[in-house]
């Protein structure tokens, strides 16, 4: 069995074209990407949706990777693609990969950041070391039963690289550059883990998911307010209870009443989340000490 170090996926969402464009370029010109000596498998996540310039054809591919969905025999296009990616590069696939890196973009003002799902030690080690190298903020998404089935969770280690803002379907040179830098840094840290030369930062700063907030709804179940101008574009900035959250049609304000103290909103007004009834997500900023077992798990995986 031939093994591969890293699965790199672009275009998991078909209208997020920057990561997919990079995958195309790297396939044609291998020297454009410094993989730090690692072997890569490069895949377009959802080719059919990319051709149609849509997020997905039948359902969100990045919510398809749950055991129930994968095993129930559904024939929706994205379920078939999820099974195919696992058959090719999953832990038990024809060419299994140790790590999955999923390239995404967002219409929200998230900058360049990492998304981690749950608290797997190898994930935390890689995220911490990339944060130490680049200073990227980290969104820790966990404990949300409404949002599950993410691609990278099916691999022993995996992160999402998220860059924005950029409109859907728009190729943006800065987004491409930031995505490449983050990916190359991930590869460098994985190679260092293999060599036993990886260095942990003093701590890990995460923004831990608390929950998501929908727009107010009217009797027709339609949006009855908008994200407030004072909140728009303020991703990664603290928000206190009572702060302006939504603006009503006549100019009134709906304040935040989360009873959570200081929270940090993310993915504010992300276009793709309107169908999921998410105007933004609330997080809490936390600083964690580095657990040596994280790095040990990553080194064992890459050894």
From Swiss-Prot:
SUPFAM superfamilies named among the record's database cross-references: Zn-dependent exopeptidases (SSF53187)
Cofactors (names): Zn(2+)
E.C. no: 3.5.1.15
Enzyme class: hydrolase
Keyword Zinc applies: yes
Catalytic activity: an N-acyl-L-aspartate + H2O = a carboxylate + L-aspartate
Annotated binding of Zn(2+), by residue: 13, 16, 104
Protein name: Probable aspartoacylase
Family membership: Belongs to the AspA/AstE family. Aspartoacylase subfamily.
Organism annotation: Parasynechococcus marenigrum (strain WH8102)
Keywords: Hydrolase, Metal-binding, Zinc
Binding site for substrate: 55, 62-63, 162, 273
TM regions (residue ranges): none
UniProt xrefs under Pfam families: AstE_AspA_cat (PF24827), AstE_AspA_hybrid (PF04952)
GO molecular function: aspartoacylase activity; hydrolase activity, acting on ester bonds; zinc ion binding
CC annotations in GO: cytosol
Cofactor binding note: Binds 1 zinc ion per subunit.
